[in-house]
Structure formats: C-alpha cells, structure tokens
Amino acid sequence: MCIRDRLEYDHRRINTSSDSEALLNLFAAEIQRSVNGRPGGMEALAEDDIFRAVERTHLRAEGSYSAITLITGWGLVAFRDPNGIRPLFMGINDIDGFTERVFASESVVCKALGFEMDRDVAPGEAVIVRMDGSFSSKVCHPEPVHTPCIFEHVYFARPDSVLDGVSVHGARLRMGAALARRIQREYPDHGIEAVVPVPDSGRIAAMELAMELGVPFREGFVKNRYIGRTFIMPGQSMRKDSVKKKLNSIEEEFAGKAVLIVDDSIVRGNTSRRIVEMAKEAGAKHVFFASSAPPIVHPNVYGIDMPARNEYVAHGRTIEEIREVIGVDWLLYQELPDLIEACLGAGDTDLASFDCSCFNGEYVTGGITEEYLAKVESMRNDAAKRKASV
C-alpha cells in the first residue's frame, strides 16, 4: 500500500504529488492518533507522543527522507529515515544564554549562517527543539542501518560540506586519484596533454587526476549557471539545446591537443556526447573521457529524479558501445569498490557502506519489486514528462 492510500485511510487529502506533503501528512496523522480521545487534545501532547509518532512514521513510510516540521505550541521536529539515505545536519549557536539550532541537508549552511557545526542527525533519530530552546533526541527505530546515498558525494553535495563525517571535497579528490591509478594501469602510454573538467562537480576529481598523472589541468569549458540539470529535462531536443546553452568551449585549451575530459557521471549520455563534439569543434586531435562514477544502469527510487532505465546510455550497452555513442577515443568509468573507498574517507567514520542502488541494483530498504520499478519508470520516461509539462 502506498502512502497516499494509507493517508486516505486516515481521512487525509493530498493536494500535490510532493513526497514531502505525503510524508508530513503521515507524521501529522500519527500525532493526531496519539492524542485522539485524550482530554485536552493537542494541548496534552507530550514529548513521548512525538517520538512514538516518528517511530510509527518510520514503520509506515518506506524509502528515504529527511524531514523538518513545526508543531504549533511545541517547536521544531527533525527526523531522518532509518537508513540515513538522505543527509540531515544540525548546527548550534548560543546567543546570550539562549541556544539556537539549525537543521539542513548540508553542513555548509552552518558556516553561512554563523552557526557551529554540531553533528549529523543519526539514521532513525528524531530531534525535538522546544520554543524555549530546550533540546531532546531519540533513535526511533529498533534496527537503524547507516547506508547513505553515495551519489550525494559524487554530484549533489557542495564540495565544502561534510556528510556523515566525510568531507565531500576529500572524497572527490580520492575519486580523481583512483581514476589516475586506473589510467596508469590500463593506458600507460596515454598521451594526455591536458585534463579538462566538466564544471562544476567534475572539477575536483579532475584536478587530483591531473596532479597524479603529472599532466596540465585546464579549464576548457565555461558554464552558464542559469541552465538547469539537463539529465532530468523532458525530450531529447530540449536536452540537446540546453547543453549548447549550458557550456561554451575555450578553443585554445583544445586546439591540437589530446585532452581527457572528466565528469562526475554519465546518465543519458547527451551532455557527454555534446561536450565531446564541442572539444572536437575547438580543434582537439584526440578526446578521452573519464567518469568519477560507475555506469548508471538501475533506477534511483530514493529521491533522485533519474530517467527510465532504457534512457540510460549504459542500459544494455558495453563500455565499448558507450564509447562509440559519445564519440571518444577511449572511455573510463570509476569502479564501484574504488568509489566506495573514496567516499568512506580516511577511516575516521563509522560508515560501513552506502546505498549504491543506481550502480548495482541493490536497494538498501528492501521491498523494491520489478512491478514497483516499472510503475516508477512509467512516471519518469520522456513521454510522461512531456505530458506533465504541457
């Protein structure tokens, strides 16, 4: 039974397709259930009632979520799913003896607002901050398992953030170093004359890769920051047009050179193919390509709006076939064990593993059936997105 069906049972109406609306309505229904029939109603709500409501929400909501909500007369409640798939960070600030707290998906928010970084909200944990500044927390799941989404480190997070004790910047440096070692093993006579990143999330890995290989690092593309993510746009023509507007090449960095282009990942392949075309149009004599992430071949069901499987460039293709599609001399993907090692950090974290489902098809929450995946894909394919955008 999906959350929408469960909320109809609770006599709650969902007005949008937002998963946040559904999740918080589920939590609100559990809060209401806690005080039903109790003298005083919501005024009699106790701290233990809130923790129990979060516990029941965990049992009823499968998947990934980090939630922050307000309860009238009480204060703020923040909670994270039992696998900690999505990040949730807490900062603290003291003003004349009053303790302020801030919650956000990334630690960098604390620096921007002048708060001290406190800690990550743990998997399955709920945090209550009262109006008077008092604070309490409890892990509201009997068996939380910490498996955050590895794609946060690859692409989504800002490099100056720290996620679950691991520096995003440091993780991307290690991704670049791992790629460099692969190149040295598999292409010892690579002939690379310049390493060029795809801005912005490919930059840090490209810098470290260039340093490890002893090859010049060059900024060959200028990014238009007013164009959104192309891999989630509906329709091939729209994506191709957006790629043209999103990046512009600097010809002197390509003319007559053998260049290695480094990007964080390859999804549909449209951006990669157009970038390779731009490098060749700018005069590159050879173009190689490296991805900080392994091939994406499985749907993400934990909050990332990725395409249907048959729209991934890696779906049903070998590396050689992908190389031909994007038009490069050779193509190198990060290997999953190397990516996991890069994101685990320097051994100063209690993380054991990550959710890597878009790479290996192993969904950490369990219960993801082919029927469910087919339903998700029917809502994400190009035809569905074009219909929704009309």
Q: Predicted regions span which residues?
A:
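PRPP-dependent phosphoribosyltransferase catalytic core
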Residues: 57-58, 73-75, 80, 99, ...
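Flexible glycine/proline-rich, aromatic-decorated loop/lid segments
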Residues: 99-106, 145-146, 230-244, 289, ...
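Extended, hydrophobic alpha-helical segments in both membrane/secreted and soluble proteins
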Residues: 195, 202-209, 213, 217, ...
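Short, glycine/charge-rich flexible loops or terminal/linker lids adjacent to PRPP-binding catalytic cores
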Residues: 212-259, 270, 298-303, 307
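Flexible loop/turn segments at secondary-structure boundaries
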Residues: 76, 85-87, 110-112, 135-136, ...
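Conserved short alpha-helical segments that host acidic/polar catalytic motifs at enzyme active sites
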Residues: 4-123, 128-193, 198, 286
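A conserved beta-strand->alpha-helix junction
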Residues: 21-26, 217-228, 325-343
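Short internal beta-strands
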Residues: 15, 221, 288-291
